[in-house]
Amino acid sequence: MKLMWFHLMPYTELPDDFNKKHPSVWVDIHSSLFDPRRAHHMYNDFMDELEYAAEVGFDAICVNEHHSNGYGLMPSPNLIASSLARRTTDTALCVMGNSLALYNPPTRVAEEFAMIDCISGGRLIAGFPVGSPMDTCYAYGQNASLLRERYLEAHDLVKRAWTEKDTFAFNGRFNQQRYVNIWPRPIQNEPHPPIWIPGGGSIETWRWCAEMDYVYCYLSYYGYKAGLTTMNGFWNEMEKLGKDRNPYRAGFLQFVGVAESRQQALDLYTEPAEYFYGRCLHVDPRFALPPGYTTEATQRAGIEGMMTKAANLANPATKGAQGYEHEGHRRRRIRDRGLA
C-alpha cells in the first residue's frame, strides 16, 4: 500500500454561523467572506504542509481543481503542482486533477501536464475528473447532459497529443484543431504519464476507468463502509473484464485523525471535521444535481440502494446493524467518518 497526502486548500475562516446565514459554500458564496490578505497566509501555509508531507515520506502529494467556492481554493492546481515540482525531489505529484470538459482547447491540459512532468523529472500523476456539477455546470456554464461526452472527447485529444509523434488534425464534435503538436512532451512517454480517474461513485466513471485500465480513485467522505458498494462494483467490473485485482489499480481517499491514542485523535479530529462537514460541504441542493448530470445507471443504482436500505430498516432483524445513524451521538458520527 502507498500513502498519499491530499490537500483541498479550503478557506479556513468561514464564520461559525455560515451554514445558517449562507445558502451554499459553492457557486454563489458571497465575496465579502473572502479576505485576500488572509488567503495569502493560507496559501503559504498550505504549500508548507504539502512540502512537509513530501519531506516526511508520503509516496505522493495531491492537489485538485475547484471553482467559485470556499471548499477548495485551487481553480488551477497546475500552478500549485508546478511550484511543488521545483520544491520537492522524489515524491510523486498527483494532480487530481484537471476537469477536462472545461478546457478549450483541452490540449492546454496536455501541455501544462507535460511541463509539470518535465520540471519534476517524471513524477506527475495525471488526474482527469469529470468534475462536480457545481464547478462544471454552474460556475463554468456547461450543459449537464453533454458534459460526459465533452469530457470523453477531451480525454481522447489529450491522450493523442501525448502519444502521437507527428502533427495531426483533430475534428471532434466539441474541439476542432488543424494542427496538434504539443511542446513540451512528458518525460513519462511509454506511453504517457499514469492516469488516475477520481470519482464520487458514478457507475459510468468506474466502468470506463476499468475498461481503460486506469487507476480509479474513490473520493470517500463518509468512511470505508459507505464506499464498499462503489469499490465492490469496480472490482467486480475488473473481474468481468478478466483483469487482476492488483490493489494498485485503485485508490481510496479517506479523512483520518492520527494521535498517540484514539481519544487524543478524536479530540484533535472533531473540530476540523465539524468545520469541513458543516461548512465546506454546505452545498445548496439546487446546485448539486442539475438535470442530465447523473446518468441512468447511477440513478438506477441509487434507487435500488435506497429500496434495499428501506427494506432493511423495516426488518427488525437488521435494525441493530444500521450503524451510527441510529445512535444520535455527534462524536460517534465524527469518529465513523475517519477513525473507525
What are these model-predicted stretches?
Residues M1-T91, H192-P193:
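N-terminal beta1-alpha1-beta2 module of alpha/beta enzyme domains
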Residues L14, T107-Y214, K225-N232, N236-L241:
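Internal, glycine-rich beta/alpha segment that forms the wall or movable "lid"
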Residues N104-A114, E260-L268:
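Catalytic cores of alpha/beta
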Residues H67-P75, L100-P106, G223-L228, V258:
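Acidic-and-aromatic substrate-binding clefts and catalytic sites of carbohydrate-active enzymes
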Residues L3-H7, I61-V63, L93-M96, L124-F128, ...:
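Hydrophobic faces of well-ordered beta-strands that scaffold small-molecule active sites
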Residues W5-F34, R148-R185, K225-A340:
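An alpha-helical appendage that flanks or caps ligand/catalytic pockets
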Residues M42-A53, E112, A154, T205, ...:
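Alpha-helical packing segments of well-folded alpha/beta enzyme cores
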